[in-house]
Amino acid sequence: MAQPLILGVSGASGLIYAVRAIKHLLAADYTIELVASRASYQVWQAEQNIQMPGEPSAQAEFWRSQAGVEKGGKLICHRWGDVGATIASGSYRCAGMVVLPCSMSTVAKLAVGMSSDLLERAADVQIKEGKPLVVVPRETPLSLIHLRNLTSLAEAGVRIVPAIPAWYHQPQSVEDLVDFVVARALDQLAIDCVPLQRWQGGMEGE
């Protein structure tokens, strides 16, 4: 059985990325340990005009409803302030962690080793333990400070997967564009659960 995947949802705009990741992971029967930052609650209100529950079991039902997956896999939600959770420990065994989407505030804190909540602590643990950590920044334009922070993370072994879609798979919907980014993020953990038309070659240079 595959090890659990930690999914961090920060306060960056673009919660649809997290929703689509949950949809595909649960459909493939993965176990997800999810922690949403305090700011992500405000983003749900701003993007969808809905309120995300804070209680873990209710929040798990909320995410399943948003993803349209009633059954399959296992989704465990943690409170953002629960720094004593299992995923806050280096002894917790997992396949890795993806922060999707990842705010520049989260990037900055991780770059200097600061952790003020469970999301940041879990990500910091991945770095110190040498476990896979993927961050998906969704910010533009990027300042020099942003770039330096991302460079620091890359130098520490973190995989940086910007939320930039491709077009060669001829996307027909917003979901197609989002799924490409989700697939590329999960590729970094050798997880292949997103139906995706991958590049087949055939375009010749002039």
From Swiss-Prot:
Q: What class of enzyme is it?
A: transferase
Task: Using the record, list the residue span of the signal peptide; answer none if the entry has no such feature.
Answer: none
Keyword terms, alphabetized = Flavoprotein, FMN, Prenyltransferase, Transferase
Q: What is its EC number?
A: 2.5.1.129
Q: Report disulfide bridges, numbered on this chain.
A: none
Q: Which GO terms describe its molecular function?
A: carboxy-lyase activity; flavin prenyltransferase activity
Q: Which reaction does it catalyse?
A: dimethylallyl phosphate + FMNH2 = prenylated FMNH2 + phosphate
Cite the binding residues for FMN.
Answer: G11, A12, S13, S37, S103, M104, S105, T106, R138
Q: Which domain of life is it from?
A: Bacteria
Q: Which InterPro entries match?
A: Flavin_trans-like, Flavoprotein, UbiX-like
Residue sites binding dimethylallyl phosphate per the record: Y168, R184
SUPFAM superfamilies recorded: Homo-oligomeric flavin-containing Cys decarboxylases, HFCD
Family according to the record: Belongs to the UbiX/PAD1 family.
Q: What is the documented function of this protein?
A: Flavin prenyltransferase that catalyzes the synthesis of the prenylated FMN cofactor (prenyl-FMN) for 4-hydroxy-3-polyprenylbenzoic acid decarboxylase UbiD. The prenyltransferase is metal-independent and links a dimethylallyl moiety from dimethylallyl monophosphate (DMAP) to the flavin N5 and C6 atoms of FMN.
**What protein name is recorded for this chain?**
Flavin prenyltransferase UbiX
